[in-house]
Curated annotation (Swiss-Prot):
Annotated GO CC locations: cytoplasm; ribonucleoprotein complex; ribosome
Origin: domain of life: Bacteria
GO function term, MF aspect, one: structural constituent of ribosome
Name of this protein: Large ribosomal subunit protein bL21
Record's subunit section: Part of the 50S ribosomal subunit. Contacts protein L20.
Family to which this protein belongs: Belongs to the bacterial ribosomal protein bL21 family.
A Pfam entry, by short name: Ribosomal_L21p
Keywords for this protein: Ribonucleoprotein, Ribosomal protein, RNA-binding, rRNA-binding
Ion transport listed as a keyword: no
GO biological process: one example: translation
InterPro entries: bL21-like, bL21-like_sf, Ribosomal_bL21, Ribosomal_bL21_CS
Amino acid sequence: MFAIFQTGGKQYKVQQGEKIYVEKLDLEVGSKISFDQVIMVEGSVGTPFVKNAVVNATVLKQGKQKKINIIKFKSKKHHLKRQGHRQPYTQLVIDSISVK
């Protein structure tokens, strides 16, 4: 069984037991979370969400992605600006997908 749910402004297609990376959630490692904004479950599409559908997950890890470097350069002006960014993420494992 698969489901598509929404969190952090993005949509994720998941199956039970799958590990996914989502935008940072303010939760501790080992805590459980339920997503009720389920867009699709095994072929039944919601308008906009499927009623009584829930995706349950457990937080595995909190971390930061690989650093990206941003360089802004103006030619002939001897101006160079460097900046780095590491996007925070939360790794989840999908425990169950249920429709009541």
